[in-house]
Amino acid sequence: MAAMAVGGAGGSRVSSGRDLNCVPEIADTLGAVAKQGFDFLCMPVFHPRFKREFTQEPAKSRPGPQTRSDLLLSGRDWNTLIVGKLSPWIRPDSKVEKIRRNSEAAMLQELNFGAYLGLPAFLLPLNQEDNTNLARVLTNHIHTGHHSSMFWMRVPLVAPEDLRDDIIENAPTSHTEEYSGEEKTWMWWHNFRTLCDYSKRIAVALEIGADLPSNHVIDRWLGEPIKAAILPTSIFLTNKKGFPVLSKMHQRLIFRLLKLEVQFIITGTNHHSEKEFCSYLQYLEYLSQNRPPPNAYELFAKGYEDYLQSPLQPLMDNLESQTYEVFEKDPIKYSQYQQAIYKCLLDRVPEEEKDTNIQVLMVLGAGRGPLVNASLRAAKQADRRIKLYAVEKNPNAVVTLENWQFEEWGSQVTVVSSDMREWVAPEKADIIVSELLGSFADNELSPESLDGAQHFLKDDGVSIPGEYTSFLAPISSSKLYNEVRACREKDRDPEAQFEMPYVVRLHNFHQLSAPQPCFTFSHPNRDPMIDNNRYCTLEFPVEVNTVLHGFAGYFETVLYQDITLSIRPETHSPGMFSWFPILFPIKQPITVREGQTICVRFWRCSNSKKVWYEWAVTAPVCSAIHNPTGRSYTIGL
């Protein structure tokens, strides 16, 4: 039987299904489809023309089986190789009550039979604006059974009437719908999944036509939970050798869908009759193998896509060995630090003083020693003399530092087992070097740590980094909204999980506007009264109808002069993977109309024991203030 099944887009191989409207002999058809290389079959569970009557006699009591026996296939085949399809005559949102009632009963009958068979997924059409009753019937079905099927909503990328050739150009058309053109089908989907309360079991099967909408519409779809892409054979062109191919625009869309690991469903008859039907599938395989290779960041992040992690608290907690190990593997970060220290040493020590002027360097938060090694390499590269202090509060990491010193560094490095804020330094430093930044710059309390340590920096001393800025951007992602919603803990407030940030490799999301700077900190901080509390207001113009689920956070830092590190997408340091972005969720999704502005307020607050963020949306509508008094999330000092 087929090598793989529904839900298994494993490795680089394309997972694909064949869509058929009529299957006279199910076992034979399944065998033939598997032979062509497909992994599953989409087919009606009942005969598509067999309309059942649920209210009127005598048809209501018609004898005989309603559909064919489940014994035609093994349980395993039903479970893995068949995706059910709803009969095309079922219209639960019909304005005619008799049709509506009959459709409801027939739909439940088909869904229940699909659950009885244990189908992995069921395809349901979304092909009009009003799908409210469809949503109700499906939601009730999901909440009553113990089945685990996924429900794939078949949504066209462009509404069928937008492709009509019979509309006279520039003539007024009768528009009854609120949204026209490219917006339409996304609004059908958005309203439907909102009615279904963002159920994790409802996903998109996106039907791709010959005409593609504009890029921003496609971008928005890619923030949705797309599980399948339906490709009609009619959209394929023919190359010189008679094989089916896709246009360049379609190829670009396929590449982006492959990144989301969607499964492809081929529908329609063979339009390239001299070629085997499997040539459509072979072309998709060809595209998969010839897509741009993943970069170093994507390779490192594999498996972490949209996986929520709690931000580290290295001040309050001692990190584990593996955590240090991951950070030390970053090839870019430490070469940038080395370059910054190198430039700083050259600026501070003129050539004629290179043998007499010994610069005192203090690595604050030395961890297992990567910055100490970067400093030693920089001194060698600059041909300047340095004296090093490696200060680390984690007693476990100090063991590693002391071994380094014993085996490699010698008397050039002094290892100090102490919190930098409490250490009484024997002398003042020319340069302090630290790597205390989190995904949102200051969220691992770099400002508080460095402010507490700057009393042992000389008046003309330098801090590396010298400055850092956090950035925020509004995003839409039902995947991430659902992931956050699922983080509910039984002893906490039911919405506490929406009042804390998460470190996450953003993947299945749509950024609604470019990131804007939020908070900036500079070191050394020479203000007479140091206050690291902050408040900012950011306004983001939005050019599409969409829904806001939260904010992505990034940072940029100036290590020294023109040497920088960044995880802001526009300026991301190539190949650097030490930091994933941070996510600040909001409790309730907010619908945003094209042309509106999203206004967010962000606070950085603190008391003597902890630091926390608070945030609120104030336009286009007001949200609650999230995390007041740090009730759900704080960072311990």
Swiss-Prot record:
It comes from the Eukaryota. S-adenosyl-L-methionine binds at Y324, K333, Y334, E392, D419, M420. The record marks F327 as: Critical for specifying symmetric addition of methyl groups. Residues 465-637 are annotated as: Beta barrel. Residues 308-615 form the SAM-dependent MTase PRMT-type domain. The modification N-acetylalanine is found at A2. Its EC number is 2.1.1.320. It catalyses: L-arginyl-[protein] + 2 S-adenosyl-L-methionine = N(omega),N(omega)'-dimethyl-L-arginyl-[protein] + 2 S-adenosyl-L-homocysteine + 2 H(+). CDD domains: AdoMet_MTases (cd02440). Activity is increased by EGF, HGF, FGF1 or FGF2 treatments, and slightly decreased by NGF treatment. It is found in: Cytoplasm; Nucleus; Golgi apparatus. Signal peptide: none annotated. GO terms for cellular component: cytosol; Golgi apparatus; methylosome; nucleus. Residues 13-292 are annotated as: TIM barrel. GO terms for molecular function: E-box binding; histone arginine N-methyltransferase activity; histone H4R3 methyltransferase activity; methyl-CpG binding; protein-arginine N-methyltransferase activity; protein-arginine omega-N symmetric methyltransferase activity; transcription corepressor activity. The keyword GTP-binding does not apply. A protein binds at F327, E435, E444. GO terms for biological process: circadian regulation of gene expression; DNA-templated transcription termination; endothelial cell activation; Golgi ribbon formation; peptidyl-arginine methylation; regulation of DNA-templated transcription; spliceosomal snRNP assembly. Residues 488-494 are annotated as: Dimerization. Gene3D superfamilies: Divalent-metal-dependent TIM barrel enzymes, Hnrnp arginine n-methyltransferase1, Vaccinia Virus protein VP39. Coiled coil: none annotated. Arginine methyltransferase that can both catalyze the formation of omega-N monomethylarginine (MMA) and symmetrical dimethylarginine (sDMA), with a preference for the formation of MMA. Specifically mediates the symmetrical dimethylation of arginine residues in the small nuclear ribonucleoproteins Sm D1 (SNRPD1) and Sm D3 (SNRPD3); such methylation being required for the assembly and biogenesis of snRNP core particles. Methylates SUPT5H and may regulate its transcriptional elongation properties. May methylate the N-terminal region of MBD2. Forms, at least, homodimers and homotetramers. Component of the methylosome complex, composed of PRMT5, WDR77 and CLNS1A. Found in a complex composed of PRMT5, WDR77 and RIOK1. RIOK1 and CLNS1A associate with PRMT5 in a mutually exclusive fashion, which allows the recruitment of distinct methylation substrates, such as nucleolin/NCL and Sm proteins, respectively. Interacts with PRDM1. Identified in a complex composed of methylosome and PRMT1 and ERH. Interacts with EGFR; methylates EGFR and stimulates EGFR-mediated ERK activation. Interacts with HOXA9. Interacts with SRGAP2. Belongs to the class I-like SAM-binding methyltransferase superfamily. Protein arginine N-methyltransferase family. This is Protein arginine N-methyltransferase 5. It comes from Bos taurus (Bovine).
